[in-house]
Amino acid sequence: MATKKGIVKKTPITDYANVRKTGLAAITLREDDELIEVKKTDNEQDIFLVTKYGQCIRFNERDVRSTGRTSMGVIGMNLTDGDKVVGMQMESQGESLMIVSEKGLGKCTLASEFTAQNRGGKGVKCYKITEKTGNIVGVKAVNQDDEMMLITTEGIIIRIKVSDTTLLGRITSGVKLINLDENVTVASIAKVREDKSLIDNADTSELLSEEEEKESAAIAAENAKKASVENTETDDELMKELLERAEADGSEDEEE
């Protein structure tokens, strides 16, 4: 687990085996702190923490001792005044870090450019913050076949391919990913990836060929035409019957 104040915590999943209807306490948070991300690990991963001011620290999770459910955790990263952690990623999630700033700029940087160090440090610069870029809003570990979604403060969403994003060095700003109106910023980012297994496992045995599709469309059009004629004939017959009833009712009124 990681909090915005740079605290990290590692707890065995077995500690959460018996969850009550009202839930279980997962972590004790310090004042003004909040949980930002949770990852399932194997106790062998390198962890990346990235802050809104463009700092990044990489350390191995073995540096984080395992603690109980209600513990606070330990310091993962020392932050400067006003800074906060915006994302936690693991090396197994991707070969690069995609970092996006609030004014719609972003870049990919190889994870290998970040040297592992002991937890609790200030990290290294991972993004050049300027007035043009704004602060960092999110980070995702990605591979070239991944796709990303960006959502703005106005609720606009775009989807981009990681392969179309520029691969840049550690101490650089990004390139334009989305055009934003004045006073609109990127609110959040997410990684999406096509599940090829769904396509591979799809049953295509009942799919029609191109000729069968044309034949089916022709039959459907002919049936629709017949239905239209039948409906017209039925309407004419119904109208004729109603007129006959009206004439009969008029005759009865005259006899009375």
Name what the model sees in each region.
Residues M1-E256:
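C-terminal interaction appendages of subunits in large macromolecular complexes
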